[in-house]
A protein has these predicted regions:
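Active-site/acyl-donor-binding loops of N-acyltransferases
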Residues: 141-185
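Alpha-helical elements of Rossmann-like donor-binding domains used by nucleotide-donor carbohydrate transfer enzymes
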Residues: 7-11, 127-131, 162
Length: 185
């Protein structure tokens, strides 16, 4: 799908009013860094405790635990280094955005986009969860329409394959319909 430009989305909101829902997932980088520093500090204490225990009395179990917690600590330190890079982009980072349209019997996930370098935060999945909860479950709507997919789906290298797999990750299924069109008014 191609980006249709800001004017299109303004007209869309004007046409659909309160039935159109724009959702944005943001990373509050200061909070993220503080949380990761706290987790890193807890992991560092665990590693130090396990290392002392292993040095005093080496066992296979303690060695395994030490290895696992050391890997967790390294991962936390890596995330903190990445976060320091992200912080250069600002204090609040828009990671993904989506447009949903509510109808009486379904909610349609119409458009979305995400910032590639923030994909490890799974912002698109967070938006989906939030939309399913607030636009479907809370309203008693039983159909959540992931809308369009395109591509060659039996080719793992097709660009559309990732979109299909993302949507199937929510237990979705393919319902083949006639497609989309623009009706001039």
């Amino acid at each position: 799908f191609e980006y249709r430009g800001e004017a299109y989305f303004r007209k869309f909101k004007q046409a659909y009013g309160s039935k159109a829902h724009f959702m944005v997932a943001q990373i509050h980088i200061g909070e993220y860094i503080a949380d990761m520093e706290s987790k890193r500090d807890v992991l560092r204490k665990k590693v130090d405790t396990l290392q002392a225990k292993y040095d005093e009395h080496p066992t296979t179990k303690t060695g395994r635990q030490l290895g696992e917690e050391s890997r967790n600590l390294a991962a936390a330190e890596k995330r903190l280094a990445e976060a320091a890079e992200y912080a250069k982009d600002g204090d609040v980072l828009p990671a993904a955005a989506s447009l949903f349209v509510e109808h009486a019997r379904e909610t349609v996930y119409l458009f979305s986009g995400s910032v590639e370098k923030y994909k490890p935060f799974y912002a698109s999945a967070l938006i989906q969860h939030d939309a399913m909860l607030h636009l479907c479950v809370e309203r008693g709507v039983t159909r959540y329409n992931f809308y369009g997919i395109d591509g060659v789906f039996d080719d793992p290298n097709s660009e559309g394959r990732g979109v299909l797999e993302f949507k199937q990750g929510f237990n979705g299924y393919v319902d083949e319909l006639m497609g989309s069109f623009v009706l001039p008014v």
